[in-house]
């Protein structure tokens, strides 16, 4: 009996399912049915499987596509190799979807950025560089999916996000040398101007922004998956989660700084709810000064430093989008296939 796969979870998790689904279509069933329970727009970035994907609310989906299938909901967090840190999300989905008995090599992403999002990314990055008087841009994603805003406080009980104090420190220090673009869907509470752009962009536009940037710095969240897929150098700081599970230690362009290595306890998400593990992990992203310095150095070692000069800056929200009436040139488009 043929299978239909249901994919759910956060954006990074959904993205990590794509390589295994592509392999399944190419090697097992070219007509495979994939049901998107979340983040359907991310499937559009895969030229291989985008025509095999249906949203949950598609009219007639059950009768027309599912009734004669075995319905499968792959759950990587319940895979022994995953919760014992033997595979990352990409490999875990591959084992579950393609029935690998041995741990497979990590499969590559095959992402396609459409022209609209490429243009958006290039325009925004160039605008921010010009505004801050810098020649290089760094995308900084400080918060993971567990972040919560409570009044003037931003907290992450899951221990995956940068502490607010360190967010300000990172932006201030990197802003001396680079145009900093903060990737966040939550407003940062502050009474002073941050030397960074905080654009309002959707997930596909962020793909374009990271593609046009020079470096990525982040935590256990979506942006690092984009950076890996788009061959961007990156620094990933982990706290409560294991880099072997959620990141790409084998990527030579990645610097992984494991802040929670000596103190974290595995939190069995989607298996059980371990309140003790969550409580013990919640401070896993508090940075000591020496760790903070390592983070900054990992960026400056790759990009170099720029001369200091005073720059007047204003908040950047959206980038100009080229039209047929523009007299200036459009940015260079990337190849259709962007391979990790």
Q: Could you say what each language-model-derived stretch is?
A:
Residues 1-47:
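N-terminal pre-catalytic "stem/leader" segment of glycosyltransferase-like enzymes
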Residues 2, 137, 215, 315-317:
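Structural motif
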Residues 11, 15, 153-244:
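Donor-binding and catalytic core of enzymes assembling or modifying cell-surface/extracellular glycoconjugates
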Residues 38-120, 127, 131-153, 241-244:
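Conserved nucleotide-diphosphate donor binding/catalytic pocket of glycan-assembly enzymes
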Residues 78-127, 131, 250-308:
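Leloir-type glycosyltransferase catalytic cores
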Residues 145-152, 189-192, 265-266:
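Short acidic/His/Gly/Ser-rich catalytic and metal-binding motifs that mark active-site loops
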Residues 307-340:
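An N-terminally biased module of ancient metal coordination in phosphate/nucleic-acid-related enzymes
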């Amino acid at each position: 009996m043929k299978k239909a796969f249901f994919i759910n979870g956060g954006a990074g998790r959904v993205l990590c399912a794509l390589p295994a689904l592509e392999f399944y279509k190419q090697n097992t069933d070219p007509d495979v049915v994939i049901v998107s329970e979340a983040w359907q727009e991310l499937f559009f970035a895969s030229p291989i499987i985008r025509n095999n994907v249906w949203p949950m609310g598609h009219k007639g989906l059950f009768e027309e596509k599912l009734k004669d299938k075995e319905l499968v909901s792959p759950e990587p967090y319940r895979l022994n190799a995953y919760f014992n840190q033997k595979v990352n999300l990409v490999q875990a989905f591959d084992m579950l979807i393609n029935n690998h008995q041995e741990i497979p090599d990590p499969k590559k992403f095959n992402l396609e950025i459409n022209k609209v999002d490429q243009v958006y990314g290039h325009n925004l990055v160039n605008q921010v560089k010009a505004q801050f008087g810098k020649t290089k841009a760094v995308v900084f994603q400080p918060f993971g999916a567990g972040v919560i805003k409570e009044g003037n406080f931003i907290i992450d009980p899951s221990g995956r996000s940068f502490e607010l104090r360190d967010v300000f420190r990172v932006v201030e220090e990197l802003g001396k040398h680079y145009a900093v673009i903060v990737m966040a869907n939550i407003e940062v509470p502050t009474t002073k101007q941050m030397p960074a752009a905080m654009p309002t962009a959707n997930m596909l536009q962020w793909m374009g922004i990271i593609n046009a940037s020079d470096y990525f710095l982040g935590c256990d969240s979506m942006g690092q998956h984009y950076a890996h897929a788009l061959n961007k150098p990156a620094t990933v700081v982990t706290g409560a989660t294991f880099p072997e599970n959620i990141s790409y230690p084998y990527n030579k362009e990645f610097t992984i700084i494991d802040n929670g290595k000596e103190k974290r306890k595995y939190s069995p998400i989607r298996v059980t709810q371990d309140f003790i593990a969550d409580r013990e992990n919640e401070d896993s992203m508090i940075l000591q000064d020496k760790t903070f310095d390592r983070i900054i150095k990992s960026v400056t070692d790759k990009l170099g430093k720029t001369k200091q000069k005073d720059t007047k800056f204003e908040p950047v929200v959206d980038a100009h989008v080229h039209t047929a009436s523009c007299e200036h040139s459009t940015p260079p488009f990337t190849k259709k296939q962007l391979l990790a």
